[in-house]
């Protein structure tokens, strides 16, 4: 029976393909999933001229990294909270995995001695609830008024940026910088943004590697949904590939 596979590429709550790509990247960078236990990751809000970016990345990050025994710190200005249900899940998972989860309104506190930093903008959950309600009521004037308030509030936090000074607070000043891309780069894509150009350029190659995992994550999701015994199926495919390669080498010898 032919059955289509449904993959969640992103929703209001989570961004599973992105966060699993991030996870594959940090597993590679730190030499194995077992080496992530005890590592500190700072999932922090960062200023962007656009106030309404999705919450799915920070929520997905705290939802997955807390399962790996990591020290997860969620940092944002007051009023930029994520969904409370997601935070509760993160707390329970951190306790179960032997890691930790906490929230702070101090970006420097989050960056202090961090092994990994993930600074990006997102919209306040409470404001998005209001906006959804206004759209449902077709209240265009209410939407305009809300957007004005949100932009004014957003502009108060331009100091929440990933700068060289901020990176110097991390572990040995060499934390791994993550971003789901595209990033709002100060002086490049905007006047003031999430990250300084000097920081972004320093991590350009690792960022592209991070992004490159996503197609494989999506392919793995599809593969898992199509085969009852995915591990055995992969082993069989590997055996067949090895057999083909062996025959090819032998044919060349003749």
Annotate the PLM regions.
Residues 27-133, 137-141:
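Glycine-rich phosphate/diphosphate-binding loop of Rossmann-like nucleotide-binding domains
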Residues 2-4, 92-102, 173, 202-204:
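A short helix-to-beta-strand connector/capping loop
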Residues 35-37, 66, 165-174, 201-202:
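Short, conserved loop/helix-junction motifs that constitute active-site signature segments
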Residues 7-9, 40-46, 74-76, 148, ...:
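Short beta-strands and strand-loop turn motifs
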Residues 170-254:
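Adenosine-phosphate binding glycine-rich loop
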Residues 127-191:
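ADP-ribose/adenylate-binding Rossmann-like module
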Residues 1-28, 185:
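Phosphate/diphosphate ligand-binding glycine-rich loop within oxidoreductases
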